[in-house]
């Protein structure tokens, strides 16, 4: 009797996933056509949700294990994907997929490590890098060596992991009886200014004012290096560029005034966009970047902005207009800590604001869900947005 009850419950869950998935397909089609009936919801998260959650990660894998052993990275990513698809509701596909589409994912350190920064591992946090260019002389000597080989150094490891994943797929490897599908690679960028800040420990910010001419040459070197790496990897995996839908990031521009951004970083962004994007680009900026909104609108002509919790969404909509997609920005700490009453209040505040004008708003967190965030908190926010985020 108990077995039959469990079987029915399982069948009902699968049926619920299928119903949800069909609704989600219609929602995104309507959103693409400019006529969604409600506000879509997207959560941004990665396999750090698995690695840094001791309840899920019963083997106790650390990021150092994931970064040194491709089978551990593969396992961590698949465990995360399975958990996400069966526990965290939003407007994505739920349940088992036809194929596991995953990527070689070295978090946010691979570009800095490729340039020479050592990885720094923390027990309860995602990996970071140790700055290695602290002085003008070190930066100058670094540039004198020229742009690194796009497939050497840390990127050699990335390539090895990618080829290992492909080999596993070709061997017929399955997880939960589902085969591997598309294998993604790091063809994008976290942004030239952010990478420059990472590898110099922020010294480049001081250099902008102490020696602007040298700082500008250093930033161009970084941008050119990142661009060459991206071009090589696009070609390696067979992605033709430029293309529609290109998105990049550069979080550390929040440290700059509009004048400094326009002088030192905007030209780098334009070069990257011209190289990889047809049409209008998207950008992820999870800091306090309201001072750059007009420049992003008038100079980069963005079509999409992924925001962090400091962003005033109503201001963003006012400045960017109604034809730019904006995603955000329920505070990650609110989702992590709760209580549900606060989550509900903040969700209602956001979806009831003027950011929804033009029906080009995607509700989500600001930015990137913290490990150990209770799924019930995420699901509560989703249900509130789904119920009250309907357009009339």
Regions from the PLM with identified roles:
Residues 1-59, 63-66, 144-392:
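Active-site loop segments of alpha/beta catalytic cores
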């Amino acid at each position: 009797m108990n077995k039959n009850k469990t079987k029915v419950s399982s069948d009902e869950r699968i049926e619920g996933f299928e119903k949800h998935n069909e609704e989600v397909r219609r929602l995104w089609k309507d959103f693409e056509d400019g006529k969604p009936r409600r506000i879509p919801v997207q959560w941004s998260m990665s396999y750090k949700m698995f690695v840094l959650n001791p309840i899920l990660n019963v083997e106790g894998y650390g990021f150092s294990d994931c970064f040194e052993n491709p089978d551990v990275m593969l396992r961590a990513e698949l465990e995360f994907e399975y958990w996400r698809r069966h526990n965290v509701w939003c407007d994505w596909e739920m349940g088992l997929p036809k194929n596991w589409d995953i990527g070689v994912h070295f978090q946010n350190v691979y570009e800095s490590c490729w340039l020479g920064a050592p990885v720094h591992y923390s027990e309860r946090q995602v990996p970071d890098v140790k700055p290695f260019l602290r002085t003008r002389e070190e930066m100058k000597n670094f540039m004198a060596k020229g742009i690194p080989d796009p497939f050497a150094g840390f990127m050699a490891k990335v390539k090895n992991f990618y080829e290992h994943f492909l080999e596993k797929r070709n061997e017929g490897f399955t997880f939960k009886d589902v085969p591997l599908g598309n294998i993604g690679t790091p063809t994008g960028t976290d942004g030239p200014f952010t990478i420059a800040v990472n590898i110099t420990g922020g010294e480049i910010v001081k250099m902008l004012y102490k020696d602007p001419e040298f700082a500008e040459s250093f930033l161009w070197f970084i941008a050119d290096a990142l661009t060459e790496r991206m071009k090589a990897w696009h070609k390696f995996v067979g992605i033709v560029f430029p293309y529609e839908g290109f998105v990049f990031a550069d979080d550390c521009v929040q440290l700059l005034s509009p004048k400094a951004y326009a002088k030192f970083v905007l030209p780098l962004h334009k070069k990257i966009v011209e190289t990889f994007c047809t049409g209008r680009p998207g950008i992820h900026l999870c800091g306090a970047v309201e001072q750059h909104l007009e420049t992003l609108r008038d100079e980069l002509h963005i079509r999409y902005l992924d925001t962090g919790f400091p962003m005033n969404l109503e201001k963003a909509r006012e400045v960017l207009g109604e034809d730019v997609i904006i995603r955000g920005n329920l505070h990650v700490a609110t989702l992590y800590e709760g209580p549900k009453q606060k989550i509900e209040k903040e969700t209602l505040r956001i979806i009831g604001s003027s950011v929804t004008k033009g029906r080009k708003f995607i509700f989500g967190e600001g930015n990137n869900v913290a490990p150990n965030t209770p799924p019930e908190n995420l699901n509560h926010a989703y249900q509130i947005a789904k119920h009250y985020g309907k357009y009339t």
